[in-house]
Amino acid sequence: MDYVVLLKQVPDLAEELEIDAAGTGLDREWMSFVASEWDEYALEEALLLRDARGGTVTCLALGVAAGDVDELLATCLTRGADRVVKVGTFEHAPDSHTAAAAFSGALAHLHYDLVLTGVQAIDDLDGQVGPLVATNLGLPHVSVVTHIAVAGHGSTVTVHQEYAGGIVGEFEVQLPAVLCVQTSREAPRYAPVSRVRQLMKTATIEAMVGGDGGGSGLVVEAMTIPETGSTAEMINGSPQVIAERIAAILAERGIGSGVAR
């Protein structure tokens, strides 16, 4: 079976994020980027399936000016991917609709049985790329996937989908399909930095134009850092005293007026 993994670079939250001069987005000029956590789970799941059943794993990532997609793709090779492809050339990070169109265009030139991607990314949290790719290609899809098992005949997969309250749904999905992964069975495998650097110099990173999309039509008018409150009240005393003070604060704000005091 042939697996394709769609990956994205996102801001590294270990560093301080700053708003750009226009006040409509993050300042990406000096920002550090890392692979989206959920995309790493998708890659690990694809590698586990490939290792168990054979086949190939191809990784696709969008070529965005800010960031280092070559390092991302070299990391994929270090972890065990068979082929890596940089899709398109974007001056700025594309929205979900544009990204999905680019990926869909590239997938039209590849053979695949299963397309995997992360359920969402930290810089948008909308979870749209996977479903949009599936829609563009006319494929079935399942999101929030926590388990994947390929049937013996290789024409379907059984997947588990996570719901609120610890409920898990089980679905049988006809291949080819798109799955948006919430977590993998094992932690993403380690990629030594020295090996990544070596592959960045020697590995073949293919390039594809990708599909052209009109975008979502959404415009960010303003982005601000959340305001921090100036005061906080520390409540000390016995449980009875603390409970009475909490009830009083709620009553002052018109919340829970029926709470016994």
Predicted regions and their residues:
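N-terminal glycine-rich FAD/FM-binding segment characteristic of electron-transfer flavoproteins
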Residues: 1-261
